[in-house]
A protein has these predicted regions:
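Cytosolic covalent-transfer regions centered on His/Cys nucleophiles
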Residues: 1-149
């Protein structure tokens, strides 16, 4: 699934006022391309308010997501590097420097993508390289190289 990602699915060096703004900005492309509805963005934020920063996975990465029925039209993903990094309220893994917005249409169509991402992102050095990317082209090249390792 990572091979289907294009430069349009990547935003580099985004400034966000806070974690809510970071989620909104990371989801903006998916909203503009009608992959998700605005209700999905609201649901992602509302879930963090209710449950806490469970979306912060480690290595300063947040995986923003909500339930498919909250407004997903098509399986999609968007990567956003934050500059500067933004606290999400996770004592252990703040601040977040990479937000991955995942829109899944059902319970399992995204599992291959999650598996591929986990293999890449569990290495903190990989995350650092991705976050330091100068542009979407470099980010995509690095992501594809890391996937092959």
């Amino acid at each position: 699934m990572l091979e289907k990602i294009s430069e349009e699915n990547i935003s580099i060096g985004v400034h966000a006022a806070d974690w809510e703004d970071a989620i909104r900005k990371s989801a903006q492309y998916l909203l503009e391309t009608k992959k998700i509805e605005n209700s999905y963005i609201d649901a992602m934020i509302e879930t963090v308010h209710k449950i806490g920063p469970y979306i912060v996975l480690g290595n300063h990465v947040a995986l923003a997501h909500a339930r498919p029925e909250c407004g997903v039209n098509q399986l999609s993903v968007h990567f956003t590097t934050l500059n500067p990094p933004v606290p999400f309220g996770s004592e252990k893994f703040d601040p977040v420097s990479l937000v991955i917005t995942l829109a899944a249409v059902d319970a399992d169509s995204h599992l291959e993508l999650i598996s591929e991402l986990a293999n890449v992102l569990m290495d903190e050095e990989n995350v650092d390289k991705l976050v330091e990317s100068k542009n979407a082209s470099e980010f995509l090249r690095l992501l594809n190289e890391m996937k092959e390792e």
